[in-house]
Amino acid sequence: MSPRLNGGGAADGGRDELPALLAREWDLLIIGGGITGAGILLEAARRGLKALLVEQRDFAWGTSSRSSKLVHGGLRYLKEGKFGLTRESVREREHLLREAAGLVEPQSFAFGDYRGRKPGRRMFQLGLAIYDLMAGQRARHHYPRDEFLALAPNVASAELEGGMCYTDAKTDDARLVLRVLHEAQRHGGVAVNYLAVEQLLRAGDDAAQDAKHGAKAGQGAKPVQGATAGQNGTVCGARLRDGITEATHQVRARLVVSATGAWADGLRAQGGAAPRLRPLRGSHLVLPAWRLPLAQAVSLMHPADGRPVFAFPWEGVTLVGTTDVDHRANMAHEAAITRAEVDYLMAALHDQFPQLALVERDIIATYAGVRPVIDSGQSDPSKEGREHALWLENGLLTVTGGKLTTFRVIALDALKKAAPLLPGWNAELQPQPVFVQPPPLRYNRHLSVSQAARLRGRYGPQAQALVDAAHDGELETIGGSETIWAQLRWAARGEAVQKLEDLLLRRTRLGLQLRGGGVEVMARVRAICQAELGWSDVRWSAEQNAYLALWNSHYSVPVA
């Protein structure tokens, strides 16, 4: 088995090694365990930097497990004239389709051309032609009405004149983050979850900080060496609090990078910087595939406001999204769908799939993510740009904005910005493949070809070890999902699982795939957790209660 992610698994949280780990001399301290932070960790580690990533909650806890699950160029950006962003995204999509096969997969989209509705056939065909040109291949096709209805049999037929099909891609966003983190670990990167930044440390404040918090030799109290040394007020590290043990630590680094996404303004405020982000919420519905059966994705324009909405098959269920509204709730709390957003998305479904007569009780789960969007003052949230930004302020490099698809580009841009602050480091910063292709799995009669490809994509070089570690019956799928029991055991054993929600919402996606968050399979989940994590009956009961309370408050349909 490959070395596991730092931070855990054992009944005590596996945190005993943290003081020695944090006392090392680090080149980069990366704050934030989503796709942006993971990407920076990977690109830094593979180029020889000593890089440490800390995440205050769980890896992919924020936006990176609550995205729309699409790896796409963004057709709508063409309408806004953002050709550079679309071209960059399309190229990264093509890289990921090749390099992360089984995790990033092609997804065909169908878009109906309805009489009198925008954008209209000619405009949409023009956009798709540009899209294909950027990808270097033709993936668009126009179909007359009858043929389009055969491809998408449940869509509304009134006023339908035909339709277009085009290709994008989809992924399991949380598993993409974990795959990147595992790859970074292979190159010497270190990632720790449930380790929150309480305060940024600044050069010149070391003595005061050490006196106030009782830092001891060997616990990160060393003076910083490098570009920031001697510049009073410059960020040079962080005071951390362990979310599992409540212990406090200090860590120093030559450069501190904030990759905290929609939460970036919080760290920036410690240095007196004014807010620059506009958190926007994107909410989604999850329905059973049998109630909304789709052979391919369906893209549509919402009848109320003309915004794009999609429905597509994902992990054995059907996803519907997304909204785009200002998120004004407390950023310290998890985002959740609102009653108005449920109504908005259901209205889109009723308009596009009238004969299915979908109702709210069909919904298995909901989820909401908060996008880190740079505030430009647009009255319409959907008009805000989706480009990434880098700000260097008193030694803190903030990397925010951008899209899931372009995480590699964002990471390389961050390292280019960091390079002048890391004297003596002159690595080549040209793009490299995100992943090296893992060897094929040995034949196993309990796994189909598609299941084997899925495991290779999600676990890379560790896929064979996962299969070999499976107990009898653990290569079977769970409750109609595409997840197998062996994935639960593997995650509990070696993927820094600290809480039940980590296992069911991010290491696997059972919390989105099964009704009630997976309550019907809890007995078997319990057996795995107690065997691999050493949880007592009391601990299991507390974890189950906390998870189900979280699921009911943030992943179910809100009460009217």
Per-segment meaning from a language model:
Residues 1-28, 43-47:
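Extreme N-terminal leader/targeting segments of oxidoreductases
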Residues 24-26, 244-255:
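Core beta-strand elements of the Rossmann-like FAD/NAD(P) dinucleotide-binding domain
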Residues 32-34, 56:
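Glycine-rich Rossmann-fold phosphate-binding loop(s) that bind the pyrophosphate
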Residues 37:
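N-terminal Rossmann-fold NAD(P) dinucleotide-binding loop
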Residues 45-66:
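Glycine-rich FAD pyrophosphate-binding loop
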Residues 69-151, 461:
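Dinucleotide-binding Rossmann-like beta1-alpha1 core, especially the glycine-rich loop
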Residues 113-192, 200-210, 229-234, 315, ...:
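Flavin (FAD/FMN) cofactor-binding and adjacent substrate-gating region
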Residues 175, 183, 266-269, 274-320, ...:
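C-terminal catalytic lobe of FAD-dependent flavoproteins
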